Amino acid sequence: MRSLALYMCACVIALTGGRALADDWNVYLTVDNQFDVYYGTSMTTTFAAGGGSNWMVEYNFSATGRPTTDYLYVATSSDHSGAQGFIGTFHNTTLNATLSTGTTGWQVFPAGQHLPQLFGMPGSWPASQMPTQTQVDAAIAYATANSLWVAPSTAPGYDNDPSTPIAPYSFIWPTALPNIQTSAQWIWYDSGKDTSVSSVLPIPLRGFNHDEFLVFRVPGAVPEPVTAVLLGVGAVLFGRR
């Protein structure tokens, strides 16, 4: 039985091509209004890749030698007016795998709901103020420890293709970003507190304080289904006598 388990482990290695223990990344994104990109564990950031504050710019950052267990984090803030959103494409060059905003796996934590617990801070987070890395780390640890990560929200048609129909609304980001997939979606968090009516932008992409600051995250890499199954079977067989 042990020989079978060893055979199964060998199959995993063969199927994954000797999976590297570190990943390289090349990312393109923008945020209306401000953001910082980090990599790290489920509890804290360990590397700051960069940031930006001009939604008209497509920002590009790279990261090399990141652990395969890393999460990719994007901390954001807005000016609470006009429009707000986050869009990007993230390419794992080691695996030749690409993920974009709007795909499954993305999560968001609205830190503004928990400012007293996080920082002993009453009231709301100030508009147009980015959190420090230490504050982002505190938010990540609190969200993970209390299972507070939720799925982000979007609005139909708000992708990186300005020709996608969005009636009766308007597309206020009129130019496609050249290195972001056209299927990538503008995402944000919907607090459910904006009850206003607008013919320009839908909720949650029109300006409003949806419990900012926000921290988005996505797992950097997960085992392919066949790999996960073989690993599980191998572990069971290896443990049997």
Model-identified regions with their sequence ranges:
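Short, threonine-centered small-residue motifs that mark membrane-proximal processing/anchoring sites
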Residues: 2-5, 9-24, 218-231
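A generic "binding-loop/recognition-motif" signal
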Residues: 33-34, 234
